[in-house]
């Protein structure tokens, strides 16, 4: 998943609204499919954005594909991100890691046996 803008150190509201609906209504169909979030920011907010987006994957039993660093690239104007050598290297490593996981055959056929979900609250 890739976002264009980070607002106040987080993903924009339109993206969050869309992802809330998709993962609420279809999250069970995404289980065991690998996911990776990428944040593109001018300067700050990438790590908070990255964290928020990864929560959609982790609550849906999706393996999260990682890289050598947090999946972010920095730039404000078109073309500026192309100057972020470290960010671009992080994206290349992420792509290789994703390809390896996909080639390994992650999918419903190889999914672990699911347990019946137990719902508890913080206070019993």
Language-model segments: which ranges?
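Glycine-rich phosphate/pyrophosphate-binding loop and the adjoining helix
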Residues: 63-124
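Helix-loop-strand module that forms the ligand-binding subsite of alpha/beta enzymes
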Residues: 4-69
